[in-house]
From Swiss-Prot:
DNA-binding protein that specifically binds heat shock promoter elements (HSE) and activates transcription. Also required for growth at normal temperatures. It comes from Schizosaccharomyces pombe (strain 972 / ATCC 24843). It is found in: Nucleus. Pfam families: HSF_DNA-bind. Homotrimer. This is Heat shock factor protein. Gene3D superfamilies: Winged helix-like DNA-binding domain superfamily/Winged helix DNA-binding domain. Its main location: nucleus. The gene is hsf1. Keywords: Activator, DNA-binding, Nucleus, Phosphoprotein, Stress response, Transcription, Transcription regulation.
Length: 609
């Protein structure tokens, strides 16, 4: 007799079984109805149905007469099928309406059974002639028929779980898209702030350059005042007189030679008169000549250069001719020494070209004693010879004042570029090695330091100033525009993707104040969406006010000592400007400066006293 799982009640937690007909009876024939099974759970009974397939399978495995074809495993948590062909022919038709073993395996898979693999299944030749198959289910165990109600068929019950997962995925995608859109807006806002800050920085740079130009003009006025102090008796253009602080530099840079056998300053003239040679006559005339009235600031040293400067009053010859005549006619001096000195005068103080600062080397073989020529002698000599014109004074100004490189370079013609030399460079015509390697001087820039011809930015509006004088501003704006366009396209792609998925995206607005406060790139610059308002920021006059008393004092003095042509006009001469990488040419006629405001009345100071 085969005991079947007929009815299991939950009264007292005990199971009651009922006997059924024999397995060989025709009533069994795989048509038993499923019976209700009650399970105990926390004091409340719950009725569940046992499926027909699980009931038939349990009876089939428990039948001891078919143990040669199907039986329980040793552990009782699975069953074994031995010889599936014989099992399909002899056992399956008794419980099911078919004898197809493949259909039986498919039903097992539908009810949650899985095949247990064995080692012998992977070999070519097994030990047993019949193939052994094992199937297991966690709820299908020996002597536990109460678990059969848990053996259910896989239905569409798992679909709600999948739908919930799908809905969860859609919500996740929606939140992620919203976060991406917020990040895109953050980047767009940050780029806008960077663009405004960049424009503000460029504008501040322009203001600083304009302020530096004004400082340069003030320094020029101060230098004119200081130069007027050294005028010897008559009103001369202050640009032709060198400050005293720079004379010492030229005294060290331009040494000359004096003969060792130089006669005394108190020596008497040669009694031979006309019978003496030309050289002694020249020396005698030089020694007997007294300095002129205008030689107030000339050197008091006794030397050939001093005597020459004191006695030189002719405009018919250049300084080179007189120096050559004085030195070549002197007995005991070599002609090559005079030639070297002529070359040095020609190449270093020639008014026709930019000054060369290579120091000439002295001929050590000469029997000469090197002495330093006073800087005032050189300048007064050139002044008396009228060899320095107003246009050529600018080429000498780097020597006199030794300014650093200007921030406003001018256009150089081919001839000017040819004459532009570098300080400390070795020339083919001049000996090298006289300038120490530690002296790292900058190249001479042909900048007009003694005139107010530096370019003015005041005649341009803010946008034109940034475009004309700062090509990097346009490049920065172009790069920022490309980044902004890329972010806009990404935002459009995100919106299109959200529309395809049917996900509504919010505006994603950000608190600008909070973002600006927490932003690490906040430079405390003016934050504004209006670019024009930033570009039109008025310059800060607190740094260098026009009402500075020292500035006004020097302005008054400079106006008194400046040349007439430099103080009358409000517009300076045309000076074509060529800034690095400048794309647009600047019209020199636009380079005008607004008329300076009225200088306030000169206050009483100790300078006039």
């Amino acid at each position: 007799m085969i005991q079947t799982a007929s009815t299991i009640s939950s009264n007292g937690g005990t199971n009651q079984g009922m006997e059924s007909s024999s397995a060989n009876s025709p009533e069994m024939n795989g048509t038993q109805n499923s019976m209700s099974v009650g399970m105990s759970g926390s004091g409340s009974s719950q009725n569940r149905k046992i499926t027909q397939f699980s009931n038939k399978l349990y009876n089939m495995v428990n039948d001891s007469s078919t143990d040669s074809l199907i039986r329980w495993s040793d552990r009782g948590d699975s069953f074994l099928v031995i010889g599936h062909e014989d099992f399909a022919k002899l056992v399956l038709p008794r419980y099911f309406k078919h004898n197809n073993f493949s259909s039986f395996v498919r039903q097992l898979n539908m009810y949650g059974f899985h095949k247990v693999p064995h080692i012998q299944q992977g070999v070519l030749q097994s030990d047993s002639p019949n193939e052994l198959l094992e199937f297991a289910n966690p709820n299908f165990q020996r002597d536990q028929p109460e678990l059969l109600c848990l053996v259910t068929r896989k239905k569409a019950g798992s679909q709600p779980v999948e739908e919930s997962n799908t809905s969860l995925d859609m919500s996740t995608i929606s939140s992620e898209l919203q976060n991406i859109r917020i990040q895109q807006m953050n980047l767009s806002n940050e780029l806008s702030r960077i663009q405004v800050d960049n424009a503000a920085l460029w504008q501040e740079n322009m203001e600083n350059r304009e302020r530096q130009r004004r400082h340069q003009e003030t320094i020029d006025k101060i230098l004119r005042f200081l130069a007027s102090v050294y005028l010897d008796g008559k009103q001369k253009p202050p640009s032709k007189v060198m400050p005293k602080s720079r004379r010492l530099l030229l005294e060290a840079k331009y040494p000359t030679v004096s003969p060792t056998n130089e006669p005394s300053a108190h020596s008497r003239p040669s009694p031979q008169g006309t019978t003496a040679n030309s050289s002694s006559a020249s020396i005698s005339s030089l020694h007997n000549t007294t300095p002129d009235g205008e030689g107030k600031y000339r050197s008091v040293q006794n030397g050939r250069a001093l005597n020459y400067v004191s006695s030189f009053n002719s405009d018919s010859h250049s300084p080179k001719d007189y120096i050559s005549q004085s030195y070549t006619n002197e007995p005991g001096l070599k002609k090559e020494s005079a030639d070297s000195f002529n070359n040095s005068i020609d190449s270093y103080i020639s008014p026709n070209q930019s000054p060369n600062t290579d120091v000439p080397s002295l001929n050590r073989d000469d029997t000469t004693d090197p002495k330093v020529v006073n800087t005032g002698d050189i300048i007064n000599m050139l002044d008396d010879a009228n060899s320095i014109e107003g246009s050529n004074m600018n080429s000498l100004s780097p020597l006199l004042f030794d300014y650093p490189n200007s921030l406003y370079p001018v256009n150089n013609t081919s001839s000017e570029q040819h004459h532009n030399s570098y300080r400390g460079s070795v020339s083919n015509s001049q000996p090298s090695g006289n300038l120490s390697e530690s002296t790292n001087l900058q190249p001479v820039q042909p900048v007009d330091y003694m005139s107010n011809s530096n370019p003015s930015y005041g005649s341009y509006n803010a946008e034109d100033q940034l475009t004309n004088f700062h090509p990097g501003y346009a490049m920065d704006q172009k790069r920022i525009s490309k980044l902004s366009d890329g972010i806009t396209k990404q935002d459009q792609n995100i919106q299109a993707l959200a529309d395809i998925l049917g996900i509504p995206l919010g505006d994603g607005k950000i608190d600008d104040a909070g973002f600006s406060a927490n932003s690490p790139t906040n430079l405390n610059l003016p934050v504004s969406s209006d670019l024009d308002s930033v570009l039109n920021i008025p310059p800060n006059e607190d740094v260098f006010p026009d009402s500075n008393p020292v500035f006004d004092e020097f302005t008054n003095i400079s106006n008194l000592t400046s040349p007439i042509e430099a103080s009358n006009g409000n517009t300076f001469g045309s000076n074509p400007v060529s800034l690095p990488n400048q794309q647009k040419s600047v019209n020199p006629s636009l380079m005008t400066v607004s008329s300076p405001r009225q200088v306030r009345k000169k206050r009483k100071s100790s300078i006039g006293a």
